């Protein structure tokens, strides 16, 4: 699934209705007092998170959202009807920002979250409010207030359980194709993956998790190099990172960068973008073992792990041949099971 993960929209609340200038006119009461009613309030614009919506793709086609104007007041102290609110539905995980101020207005983290993004204008006052001892027949009323208008940026952070990271061509798209139903484009050139891809990995009946394949990272990604910060943020809400490394001997690694340097380069970029990313559980996946003899691949993997001083889990796989990929997915599922058990125990203890 390709996620359109950013969108700009214009939201405009409804103006308030105008107050009415009116006078009571009934039989036998020729000089009745003022009875002009107030205008109705304008409708507001709300953003609501819905777990059944997965992307921001619809905002490619509709970018302007306007709530209804309040109706004008009427005679006999009749108030104008309030304008209807406009509701905009977004996926859970959407961050809403004010483009003019670059301020985060809200973070839609749960199904049903509601956020007021543009408040409707108040209705104007009818002339019945302006009657006084010196002005028994006021012809004064006020117009309704204008509704708020904002230019908003919607940003979707993936709510995936597992994030795949690595250099371009490390084999992330191939791995996600091997273990899920996702079918990202795969080719032997950098930045084949131009959008995040989501796949659902089913380990067994009723036991699954979501894995995100994000575009490859290179040195300078935290400054926007390559596909840069646009995709680093997709890793922030994952629970586990799988760090893919190409261990094939061609050119000494990817574009001449050794496997160890690939790992260290990306670690530096993660730390520069958000040091908390380095605190996440991260497992090492040494890929493309099929391009070497088994004994050579095993020896190379052990040498890489030793040089890195790697203490977390690591795996030697061929994503293309699907060799060694299923054990990783089983271990990931078991890791999440343990996490849930620990969270449940912590809640019960509290």
UniProtKB/Swiss-Prot annotation:
Record EC number: 3.6.5.-
One cellular component (GO) term of this entry: cytoplasm
Domain OBG-type G: 160-337
Signal peptide: none
Annotated residues for binding of Mg(2+): 173, 193
Biological processes per GO annotation: ribosome biogenesis
Annotated SUPFAM superfamilies: Obg GTP-binding protein N-terminal domain (SSF82051), P-loop containing nucleoside triphosphate hydrolases (SSF52540)
Keyword Cell membrane among record annotations: no
Cofactor(s) needed by this chain: Mg(2+)
Keywords: Cytoplasm, GTP-binding, Hydrolase, Magnesium, Metal-binding, Nucleotide-binding
One Pfam family named in its UniProt record: GTP1_OBG
Keyword Secreted: no
Residue numbers binding GTP: 166-173, 191-195, 213-216, 287-290, 318-320
GO molecular function, one term: GTP binding
Primary location class: cytoplasm
Domain Obg: 1-159
Location in or out of the cell: Cytoplasm
NCBIfam families, A to Z: Obg_CgtA, PRK12297.1, PRK12299.1
Record-stated family: Belongs to the TRAFAC class OBG-HflX-like GTPase superfamily. OBG GTPase family.
Functional note: An essential GTPase which binds GTP, GDP and possibly (p)ppGpp with moderate affinity, with high nucleotide exchange rates and a fairly low GTP hydrolysis rate. Plays a role in control of the cell cycle, stress response, ribosome biogenesis and in those bacteria that undergo differentiation, in morphogenesis control.
HAMAP family recorded: GTPase_Obg
Subunit note: Monomer.
UniProt name for this protein: GTPase Obg
Species this chain originates from: Xanthomonas campestris pv. campestris (strain ATCC 33913 / DSM 3586 / NCPPB 528 / LMG 568 / P 25)
